Structure formats: C-alpha cells, structure tokens
Amino acid sequence: MSRVCQVTSKRPAVGNNRSHALNATRRRFLPNLHTHRFWVESENRFVTLRLTAKGMRIIDKKGIDAVLAEIRARGEKI
C-alpha cells in the first residue's frame, strides 16, 4: 500500500541527511500516516481511511461527509 494520505494527498518527500561534517546522504521524509475508522451517519456505516494527523484535523474541522465528497470528486473509491 502506498504511503499517501487520502485526505491531503501528502506523499513521501526526498531530501538529505546532513552529518556534523555536512556529508549528504539521500533519505525519505515519510508522512505521519494512521489508519482510522470514521462513522458516517449519512451512510450508516464505518469508513476506514489512511490519513495523516493533519488529515484528521481537517475532518474535525469540515466534517466527514464534506471530506468524503471531496475524495470521491477526485475519483478515489472509498
């Protein structure tokens, strides 16, 4: 399964580890992903999403129904 947030579409970023001597070695910055179940009252079922901590805060702010509508508008199947 890819490491992508279903709400924010955040993906791993690439950069460098920098040692004390400023040697650069490539590394990946991974998103803070969690698998979380949300109860959707309008559909009378649970929906499982793989999302970042920021994605959870967006759902708290907008509501699960609005966020699911945006995800489905992008063409993702839930």
UniProtKB/Swiss-Prot annotation:
SUPFAM superfamilies: L28p-like. HAMAP family: Ribosomal_bL28 (MF_00373). GO terms for biological process: translation. It holds the Pfam family Ribosomal_L28. The keyword Ubl conjugation does not apply. GO terms for cellular component: cytosolic large ribosomal subunit. GO terms for molecular function: structural constituent of ribosome. Residues 1-20 are annotated as: Disordered. Signal peptide: none annotated. Belongs to the bacterial ribosomal protein bL28 family. Keywords: Ribonucleoprotein, Ribosomal protein. NCBIfam families: L28 (TIGR00009). This is Large ribosomal subunit protein bL28.
